[in-house]
Regions:
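Active-site nucleotide/adenylate-binding loops and adjacent lid/helix of ATP-dependent enzymes
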Residues: 2-209
């Protein structure tokens, strides 16, 4: 099967950031056919994918797009299992090895009601992310005094359920961010992908992993 026979169905509106690479540009450069599924803000639904399930289709986009529009395409989308929940893997290893070892867990809808308690525990700034590896919203740090506006914005953009469990921890400064692929306990490849909040891809970090 040649790469021209592989088709992609994508929805990238939620991922667009100025200066960041776009997957649709990579598909165009490689002459790969793709369909961009638009998100309707009124119905909160994605447009249907016009490909057949007997075609080779790769899916890429937000979790809701994958869950609602994957009709059984092969290979489809690559995602996460429950063992990528932070509460799962952080309970298997010494918590002091984790950046957010001081974390606690709260349902998304309860965070706003725990404002003063969180301030007493963590100080003026906190970090919030979904427990799930699927990340229905991107983790963020926020000043406790601004938490109402930030949670309201997150609800409107990402629509997390009120009962979705979230990791809440003291906000910490991050310079470098990395991703590595590990197989059978061995780091196979990886890269730095961000430095001080800006896109900065480096691949000379494998030996340091």
């Amino acid at each position: 099967m040649t790469k021209k026979q592989v088709k992609w169905a994508i929805s990238t509106e939620a991922f667009g950031k100025p200066g960041f690479p776009r997957i649709e540009d990579a598909l165009k450069r490689n002459n790969i056919e793709y369909f961009q599924s638009a998100f309707n803000s009124n119905t909160r639904e994605y447009s249907d994918i016009p490909y057949n399930t007997d075609e080779c289709v790769v899916l890429y986009g937000p979790i809701k797009f994958i869950r609602t529009k994957n009709k059984g395409f092969m290979p489809g989308a690559f995602g996460f299992k429950s063992d990528t929940n932070t509460s799962y893997y952080m309970s298997q290893i010494n918590p002091n090895l984790f950046f957010n070892h001081d974390a606690m867990y709260l349902p998304f809808g309860s965070i706003i009601h725990k404002k003063e308690q969180l301030k007493d525990i963590f100080g003026k700034y906190i970090f919030i992310r979904p427990d799930s590896g699927f990340k229905t919203f991107t983790g963020f740090h926020v000043k406790i005094d601004d938490i109402e506006d930030e949670l309201s914005s997150t609800s409107q953009i990402s629509n997390p359920s009120p009962h979705e469990m979230c990791l809440v921890a003291k906000a910490k400064s991050i310079l470098g961010e990395y991703r590595f692929v590990v197989c059978n306990g061995e780091v196979i490849t990886g890269s730095q992908y961000r430095w001080d909040g800006k896109l900065d891809v480096r691949i000379d970090v494998h030996d340091e992993a």
